[in-house]
Amino acid sequence: MMNTSNGMISAPSSSSSPAANPQSPGIKTYFKTPEGKYKLHYEKTHSSGLLHYAHGKTVTQVTLAQLKERAAPSTPTGTSSGYSTSSGFRSATARLLGTGNGSRALSFVGGNGGGKSVSTSSRISGSFAPSNSSTSMTNTNFDGKGTYLVFNVSDAIFICDLNSQDKDPVKSIHFSNSNPMCHAFDPDAKDGHDLLIGLNSGDVYTVSLRQQLQDVSKKLVGALHYNKDGSVNNSRCTSISWVPGGDGAFVVAHADGNLYVYEKNKDGATESTFPAIRDPTQFSVDKAKYSKSNPVARWHICQGSVNSIAFSNDGAHLATVGRDGYLRIFDFLTQKLVCGGKSYYGALLCCSWSMDGKYILTGGEDDLVQVWSMDDRKVVAWGEGHNSWVSGVAFDSYWSSPNSDGSGEHVMYRFGSVGQDTQLLLWDLEMDEIVVPLRRAPGGSPTYSTGSSAHWDNVIPMGTLQPAPCKRDVPKLSPIIAHRVHTEPLSGLMFTQESVVTACREGHIKIWTRPSESETQSNSSEANPTSALLSTSFTKDNKASLSSKIIGGSTFKQ
Amino acid sequence: MGAAGSKLEKALGDQFPEGERYFGFENFGNTCYCNSVLQALYFCVPFREQLLEYYTSNKSVADAEENLMTCLADLFSQISSQKKKTGVIAPKRFVQRLKKQNELFRSYMHQDAHEFLNYLLNEVVDILEKEAKATKTEHETSSSSSPEKIANGLKVPQANGVVHKEPIVTWVHNIFQGILTNETRCLRCETVTARDETFLDLSLDIEQNSSITSCLKNFSSTETLHAEDKFFCDKCCSLQEAQKRMKIKKPPHILVIHLKRFKYIEQLGRYKKLSYRVVFPLELKLSNTVEPYADVEYSLFAVVVHVGSGPNHGHYVSLVKSHNHWLFFDDENVEMIEESAVQTFFGSSQEYSSNTDHGYILFYESLGPTK
């Protein structure tokens, strides 16, 4: 069954190996960082011949989806649920950053189900040898666990096996009515509907990812359909997210500046109605007129599009960025604005939380990566280095400072950004260097001219939005590396335990394995000469119990 | 074309801006370069207002000699005084005058919109300066008082001792002119020589997959003068290696940015169109200004778009923002477009692409004080 489906999809171009890389002339297959070399491991793409661009171009977003063993849904066992996407981190706050509590040693990755042994052996040579056995390798057992990349291109959703060298998707789902624009996955979804899909028409679907993988057709199966034909809101879905710990609740942002809250157990068929928006310039929340219908609430955020939303890992805060250039942070339960501020100029395109919920990254049309502090309720640093708009930002929650002593005093964050300049940039945020000087008394810091810092010296009250800061007031960061990773403008970035995943707007995805520093740790397990290069993929299951501590995740929004 | 007009009216409905007119321009054989630029200038509100003011105050002068500016003023006045809200106008007199006056634009060949804009603005400046000189000498002979503002909204520079030496500042200067400062630092004696120059628009080199912000940064990046290209330092009295950088000393009220999409390729012996994807934000701040202009914000209000894969053929259209609506002008056709549609004119990240509609001249208006 699966073979049929796979054969169809992968037929035209499955023979190209990632290293051959025909579409990326002049692009290196590695980049160097202080901690070592990141190497291009796999590429994922789609057969564009199958696509018809009738609906116009879309921008690819990528979601990482971790399917757990079906037999044991209740126990969060060894499956490294760490790299799920934006949601489902009930114990996320338990993880402290920068304490270096063994996260380096944890390099387990769940190979995908029944295909594991096959893919493992092929993986060793996979990067460089032409693959001539793709059909046998794609015989993956979708009942088992696995890690998948879900991405949208034009009118289709594609699903790839993250840990397979196969370039082509294992599954494609075509939408006849409209283009999928955004998606999200919850590994802990209770009733099996774990994947959310938002469409250009405003329609929203929830489905079971496993059910899609098991089905041979190119249609969405077993879907629950909300906002049918845009009956509640017919503007484009821009960003979608599960509410962490929200018991199946999810939030959909639209291009008209509204976002809607859905509850899973409510009826999608009954149409919700909302009162007219009183003042389009003001934030307002309205409940649906009938309590049994979905969506249950409408939040009018701003004029112009909401471009991206992200929940803090504990689900307490919701960040939104939009066309008006404002980052807004809301308390999700009380539905109140906590704080926010404007970009230097232009729209903001993406946002992402640090694991501890203390910082938010944004990227936008001013070519800057902004670091927003929740403690200070203001921008604490600008990352300068992109030559075009910043389209994806993410903290690397698996990274720990090499010189961190666990005291929490020198917590350093690593984060990444991708832009329409086709570059991936990595940054280090050292608290000593950035935040502490800013808290000094006026004139106390030799780096800043006196008298300039109204922005920095005032305590910013709750519930207010900050205007764009003056250029000279904001400390600047420089990237530790800048690497051109694709030929096309990029649209997304995420960190997994063993890799960095980059995606371009046209739907090509590259998976860069982390430097093999952890190879020393993994040498104890079945040392194979070649395993050093790919060590992260091989570590044995017996370490898996440890990895359950690491509830990581990278929000991945365009 | 009346049908198209009413379609636009329907699309705007009761949101049709009071007193505003949206008229397409007839094409007289490859005059789209002219049409697209004229639309952008018409929706450059300070320019339109000044020109219409000039028109009204000069109408009484019966024997006024026809020139390019009177033809333009006449055209703008024709549009603004139309009874209908939408429709088509033939800018016949203007085009005839243009062709009569400059042989460059006489042929039916494809013309460069930027060259035309440049020519037009300089021509208007010349005419205003000539008139100002005439008025000035008149004033000087009749009375020696130096009025701050004289007819036609023409401003004479503030009296700070050098009034008579200063070049005449016309309203075109007040709208479009900025000042660049060219700082050269001799690497031997460290002396910085600054030389100011004025500009009506900035021509920027472009790179693949970059932004206007980045192109502006490159424009102001430090360049080292060495080897054949050394700098004559007045202090050292000899040719020296030096570092040079351009900064914007005074940002203009209306910032016109020309993307150098037509590049001479030596190996080919001809010009080639660069279809690079260069993104331009709807709001912009200049990174390369000197204080106190560092955080002046600009808002995009018009884009002249070149359509086509080569420099010698193709088409020009323009995108215009008027009263918070974006409009698409393609000769006689006018349509409303979504703001997000502006993004489809950024260019292509692949060399050979079916998308050949590329932003070529950008018009930004300052939202803050630039004076």
UniProtKB/Swiss-Prot annotation, chain B:
GO molecular function: cysteine-type deubiquitinase activity
UniProt xrefs under InterPro entries: Papain-like_cys_pep_sf, Peptidase_C19, Peptidase_C19_UCH, USP_CS, USP_dom
Enzyme class, first EC level, given as a word: hydrolase
The keyword Protease belongs to this UniProt entry's keyword annotation: yes
Catalysed reactions listed for this entry: Thiol-dependent hydrolysis of ester, thioester, amide, peptide and isopeptide bonds formed by the C-terminal Gly of ubiquitin (a 76-residue protein attached to proteins as an intracellular targeting signal)
UniProt KW keywords: Hydrolase, Lipoprotein, Myristate, Nucleus, Protease, Thiol protease, Ubl conjugation pathway
USP domain segment(s): 23-367
Enzyme Commission no: 3.4.19.12
Extent of motif Bipartite nuclear localization signal: 83-100
Domain of life: Eukaryota
Subcellular localization(s) per the UniProt record: Nucleus
Residues lipid-modified (N-myristoyl glycine): 2
GO CC term, one of those recorded: nucleus
Gene Ontology terms: biological process: protein deubiquitination; proteolysis
Protein name: Ubiquitin carboxyl-terminal hydrolase 3
Source organism of the structure: Arabidopsis thaliana
